């Protein structure tokens, strides 16, 4: 926990099992960064949260095409993607090779993030809108929003993240896995 204002840190406390000098993953904190980036696009009037995802990502699969961007941000989309780590055939396990968390099955083609997200379908005879008043947590939602940020801005998530980290004044290394579109991956090679 860190409490600060501008360049001043007023309080800093670490859990016993996460000492200050130990690298730690930021996992879902990535979602916070993506929301900050969307906020900047919103402030610049570059994004309309009431538009359907397919407006920004024309090739996106039926699992997101007709969802409003706001609903994806709110984890308020019902589709065939599942993120239940207790289920052996959860979609999330198929998503892991995209980011390099697992090796693809022998003979499988390695998909880009965008290619994988384009395969997510809607549930049969189901509207994408969640009417249950419960959030449906899915990392794929954040990945879809990340692609939208890249498409609108023409800049990779790497670019966005570096800007945010430098503005925050982080002193030490930040290790983060960003799943790039093919265009963004090409940017890294140049």
Q: Which residues fall in each region the model found?
A:
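Aromatic- and histidine-enriched alpha-helix N-cap/loop-to-helix transition segments
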Residues: 27-33, 64-67, 136-143
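Active-site helix/loop module of the DD-peptidase/beta-lactamase fold
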Residues: 43-85, 124, 140, 152-182
């Amino acid at each position: 926990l860190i409490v600060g204002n501008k360049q001043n840190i007023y309080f800093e406390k670490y859990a016993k099992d996460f000492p200050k000098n130990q690298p730690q993953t930021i996992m879902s904190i990535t979602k916070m960064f993506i929301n900050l980036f969307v906020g900047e696009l919103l402030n610049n009037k570059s994004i309309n949260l009431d538009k359907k995802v397919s407006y920004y990502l024309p090739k996106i699969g039926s699992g997101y095409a007709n969802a409003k961007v706001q609903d994806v941000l709110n984890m308020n989309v019902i589709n065939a993607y599942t993120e239940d780590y207790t289920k052996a055939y959860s979609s999330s396990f198929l998503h892991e090779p995209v980011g390099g968390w697992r090796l693809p099955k022998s003979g499988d083609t390695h998909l880009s993030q965008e290619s994988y997200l384009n395969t997510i379908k809607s549930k049969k005879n189901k509207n994408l809108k969640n009417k249950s008043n419960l959030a449906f947590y899915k990392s794929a939602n954040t990945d879809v929003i990340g692609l939208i940020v890249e498409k609108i801005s023409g800049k990779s998530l790497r670019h966005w993240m570096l800007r945010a980290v430098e503005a925050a004044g982080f002193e030490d290394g930040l290790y983060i896995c960003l799943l790039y579109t093919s265009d963004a991956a090409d940017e890294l090679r140049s």
